[in-house]
Amino acid sequence: MASGTAVVTGGNSGLGLETVRAMAARGAVSDLVVACRDVSRGQAAVDSVATGATRLHVAELDLASLDSVRAFPAVIDALGVPPIVAVVCNAGVQVIGGTRLSQDGIEETFAVNVLGHFALVKLLLHHLAAQARVIFISSGTHDPALKTGMPNPRYAGAADLAKGLGPDDLDGGALGRFRYTTSKLCDVYLAYEFAKRYPMSGESGPTLVVSAMDPGLMAGSGLARDYGVLSRFVWRRVLPRLSRFIKGASTTEASGADVARLATDPAFAEESGLYYIGTTPSPSSVLSYDQFNAVDLWNTCATLAGIDP
């Protein structure tokens, strides 16, 4: 077994938990840190994982709180784990029932899906091994060309997204879904920008292998927790039975295995700044290559988090 630590945000349920299971089964890291808001629920989830020789740790991390994110490097220090070789930025929310703000006054979808992960990776840089892998879990919904049925993302500036502002023609649930798809576009921007700023062959400073990944439509996962009763029933009970007939559909188990491969398999250590559908390198959306937007997002996140760009 290779020595090294992997950190999985939201590793206590859904795709995150299946990623933890798959990583433990692969035995490619010596230590796995399940980073989640509720430590007791995280421990209960971890207790269900067959670990083999991999040591599992549960650590508190609330991505909706910048104070919690800032405290996380000290949590890693206290665990005494080896250097981090992989960070899976998986935790995410889709808020449909109106606008919710984080502890820092940031719209919650942006706070958790984008800003929190930006700050986490930046603050962990000096805990990372050379050429550590960083994976941002994105979504095919970021690409209008795929016609997923979700509102198309639009980028008018990260400052507006942080305030919860959106297109005038959207409200209610549609606005919440727009915030989600746009947050997934932002995750691709972050992946490309981290890859550019911390190249894997850099001569000084941290060196990273960064990617964004579309895990596919995983019906039955916890992503629909904010939907109404009927929609949750369809998502959890009906759609999983129809997944094999839906283009781009997957399961949390299959996608978790894909994430584990991207994070630990030597075959995916050769190139940084890629977008994957599953484990297949693929083009991301046309809008995701907009450098002006990527830099605006980076600088805005740095300002909001109080971190040097």
Where are these regions (language model features)?
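Alpha-helical membrane-targeting segments
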Residues: 168-177, 217-251
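Surface-exposed beta-strand-to-loop junctions
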Residues: 100-102, 169-172, 236-238, 276-280
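C-terminal helical subdomain
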Residues: 183, 237-282, 291-292
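Alpha-helical packing segments of well-folded alpha/beta enzyme cores
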Residues: 45, 186, 190, 255-259, ...
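Rossmann-fold NAD(P)H-dependent dehydrogenase/reductase core
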Residues: 1-222, 307-308
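Juxtamembrane loop segments immediately following a transmembrane helix
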Residues: 92, 156-162, 227-229, 275-281
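C-terminal amphipathic/interface module of NAD(P)-dependent oxidoreductases
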Residues: 286-309
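Glycine/proline-rich active-site loop of Rossmann-fold NAD(P)-dependent oxidoreductases
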Residues: 201-206, 223, 227, 266-271
